[in-house]
């Protein structure tokens, strides 16, 4: 099978998958739990966050973990819209966006934002 929809799902690199499985086996507790296993999971999560932040050149507090793409899209779109509302409340997107993007834009529209959705031609071009 040739899978071409990497926008929706992307196979994990085997090395990444191995690291994930090892961490999943070792750190079984909720990192917000107060018991020892939770504290160990929290320490590993903080170590990983520090490593990611260093590689990205940001502060660890700037990294936000979400449960998936829909939550991340919602947080990013509404967050930047509200943070930039003093500049303007006009957002341009496309008809091709993920449904979570559309839902966020609809919510913003109900709060006074002007939303324009551009059409895509048969070649996928705006």
Residues covered by each model-derived region:
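Pyridoxal 5′-phosphate
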Residues: 1-126
